[in-house]
Amino acid sequence: MAAAAAQGGGGGEPRRTEGVGPGVPGEVEMVKGQPFDVGPRYTQLQYIGEGAYGMVSSAYDHVRKTRVAIKKISPFEHQTYCQRTLREIQILLRFRHENVIGIRDILRASTLEAMRDVYIVQDLMETDLYKLLKSQQLSNDHICYFLYQILRGLKYIHSANVLHRDLKPSNLLINTTCDLKICDFGLARIADPEHDHTGFLTEYVATRWYRAPEIMLNSKGYTKSIDIWSVGCILAEMLSNRPIFPGKHYLDQLNHILGILGSPSQEDLNCIINMKARNYLQSLPSKTKVAWAKLFPKSDSKALDLLDRMLTFNPNKRITVEEALAHPYLEQYYDPTDEPVAEEPFTFAMELDDLPKERLKELIFQETARFQPGVLEAP
């Protein structure tokens, strides 16, 4: 769920009810029938949107004297939701970058037993790229600037040895001054090309249209190049206001990709370690690559050259984030001295996939302790 999507949405005036917030007695504002226990610091709530396991509202922060986004998450009934919540909190509390959404505050009950919800406070961003592309055609200048910021943020993420794995327009938040921040790290993973993540053509949780082909074709090999493929899909969508590979299911997704890129070369096929996948591709009719200029006749030729290097079938030949930033299309913004990297690689102390939801709840409680009143953050 995008952490701070477009403001508005019209929840109307929030009702108030007497209650006890996360450690603070007083009134509790209601948003669309949902109590938001975030007072007295955060008031004047307005509904923004909601996802599978939470609602987002804007609120006035009486300490910072500005409006913020508050994501109410109620994940504790489901292991998967607990896992994503913990992973996002762990990552975002350690990340500091202008193009990555940060966490300003976290509110929750003062005891583990009483904790039913978690409230994550973040910067309020007026819209996201998905909504923007629904409403207008972007100029080349806007496309260039947004792409630069996506890659600048991704350079930082990748330098921490983290894969986002779910880059798509709705996870790119934008404000009125065209600042862009990457959000939603619930599916993020440590980069580990040796780990066996998924079998041949099994369904994958991230949004299908932005998936790299190797995710569907290989049982191993999550590398940073999967995020570059997603950015290529996003660039194509900015150029045309429509998804470039809108597959209805994973085989259809592959057919969309090959219908534009053409059939993979023998060298590219040799990189596919899964023989079942390789045999499937070899059984398909031969397809010729479609020229990018034919698909995007009005687009900047440098943009199309970069697009070609991102949407390369073979992940070993795909451009890296550092190379993409240095591409001529982005030369007006490129500044390696102002493209910071993480201070140290990110590591998860443990693999979260196999932990029960009760243990994940304990870890979320511990991870959010620093925001409790009277708690000093450990050095």
Swiss-Prot record:
One GO-annotated biological process of the protein: ERBB2-ERBB3 signaling pathway
Pfam families: Pkinase
Sequence motif TXY, residues: 202-204
SUPFAM superfamilies the record matches: Protein kinase-like (PK-like)
This protein's UniProt keywords: Acetylation, Apoptosis, ATP-binding, Cell cycle, Cell junction, Cytoplasm, Host-virus interaction, Kinase, Membrane, Nucleotide-binding, Nucleus, Phosphoprotein, Serine/threonine-protein kinase, Transferase, Ubl conjugation
Domain notes: The TXY motif contains the threonine and tyrosine residues whose phosphorylation activates the MAP kinases.
Protein name listed in UniProt: Mitogen-activated protein kinase 3
Native organism: Homo sapiens
